[in-house]
A protein has these predicted regions:
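Active-site-adjacent pocket-lining segments in enzyme domains
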Residues: 2, 8, 15-34, 49-94, ...
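Lipid deacylating catalytic domains
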Residues: 37
């Protein structure tokens, strides 16, 4: 798992109490095919909160799929099946980097505008991908309840996810994006107002 790709979205959710006068609507849970520890690409060990079979999908706002070189594993097919069910049930699905390749292999990208590391990446590594006409060359693409991003698009991906979930006002989301993309303190002040 590429933990660097989910840093901004985790930061945005962790700030919710601070930015919403003490209220918190969203809780992040880590989910995997089982509860075995996962070694990330950066060398961190993450212990999932729950297995995919334990998730109550009637009570989630989003399923976010980080990049990973392990998406091709048979173990992850249940997660991809759940992603497809989420999309059918108007639950937001976010996929970045290698997770977009997994969605391509599963046929999901054949029905949504999307992006990935490149069109060539999807064509080369996926034998089943047929969504070429829906590919958009951008860091992040939001279409209905699917948000996809390339490996360099984690900040834009975060912005699109926050807007889709209405976590914050557009003004706060823009301040978050502008602060983390420029480092300009005026946007941090706007974020805290």
């Amino acid at each position: 798992m590429a933990e660097c790709e989910i840093g901004y979205i985790l930061q945005a959710f962790s700030m919710e109490k601070l930015l919403k006068d003490g209220t918190k609507e969203f809780e992040v849970k880590t989910v995997a095919c089982n509860k075995k520890p996962i070694l990330t690409l950066g060398g961190l060990t993450i212990i999932p909160d729950c297995a995919i079979s334990e998730v109550d999908f009637s009570n989630i706002a989003a399923l976010l799929l980080p990049g990973s070189s392990a998406w091709g594993s048979e173990d992850n097919q249940e997660i991809l099946k759940k992603a497809q069910e989420c999309l059918r049930n108007d639950i937001l699905v976010g996929a970045i980097c290698g997770a977009t390749l997994a969605l391509a292999d599963y046929g999901i990208l054949d029905r949504f505008k999307h992006t990935s590391n490149s069109l060539e990446y999807l064509n080369f590594f996926s034998k089943k991908y047929a969504g070429q006409d829906l590919y958009v060359c951008s860091n992040s693409v939001s279409d209905r309840n699917l948000v996809t991003a390339n490996s360099a698009g984690s900040l834009e991906w975060t912005k699109d996810i926050l807007k889709n979930l209405n976590v914050y006002s557009d003004k706060k989301i823009d301040a978050f994006y502008n602060y983390y993309s420029t480092g300009n303190a005026k946007y941090y002040d706007e974020l805290l107002q």
